[in-house]
């Protein structure tokens, strides 16, 4: 859903996020989940717009988080934003040891774990392996980290043996190339 709205230049962030929140709400209809989805949107948008201009991944993530925190700096969201406090200073967050990163599938932990993996690796493969090796809810953490890593490192950076193992690969490629 985020990628669909990122490529739509005629829609505002506020309108895109209303739709993203509706999609998030299908399974996780809580403001904290909406904020996490929104932060993901802003990070993904920063990667898509800044990486082609040679911005490093940390800069893209920082910019996306700043945009997200500014967007959600509203009276109704302030109490929930405190839960995302560790992500406000990426240098401090980067310095956290692995045993302080939770990967239990809880929305906040999943986003933090994905960002931590992105910051501690410099290749698509390494990022996903790091996410999986955190343990617990590995599919959630790897899906979030992998989506963002894929945007930054691109399809060509994916290990060929992983790409070859994808089921219905031709259908997925066609879907990705279609205008939705």
Regions inferred by a protein language model and the residue ranges of each:
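Extended hydrophobic-aromatic, low-complexity segments
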Residues: 124-128, 140, 159-161
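Active/binding-pocket-proximal capping segment
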Residues: 134-135, 167
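Conserved phosphate/anionic-ligand binding catalytic regions in large, soluble enzymes, centered on
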Residues: 138-150
């Amino acid at each position: 859903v985020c990628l669909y709205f990122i490529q739509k230049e005629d829609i505002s962030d506020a309108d895109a996020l209303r739709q993203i929140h509706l999609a998030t709400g299908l399974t996780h209809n809580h403001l904290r989940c909406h904020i996490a989805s929104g932060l993901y949107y802003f990070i993904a948008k920063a990667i898509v717009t800044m990486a082609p201009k040679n911005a490093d991944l940390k800069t893209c993530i920082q910019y996306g988080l700043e945009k997200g925190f500014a967007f959600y700096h509203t009276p109704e969201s302030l109490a929930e934003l405190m839960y995302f406090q560790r992500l406000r200073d990426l240098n401090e967050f980067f310095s956290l040891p692995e045993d302080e990163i939770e990967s239990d599938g809880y929305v906040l932990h999943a986003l933090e774990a994905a960002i931590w993996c992105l910051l501690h690796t410099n290749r698509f493969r390494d990022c996903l392996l790091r996410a999986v090796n955190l343990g617990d809810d590995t599919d959630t953490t790897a899906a979030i980290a992998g989506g963002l890593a894929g945007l930054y490192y691109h399809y060509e950076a994916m290990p060929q043996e992983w790409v070859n193992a994808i089921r219905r690969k031709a259908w997925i490629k066609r879907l990705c190339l279609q205008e939705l």
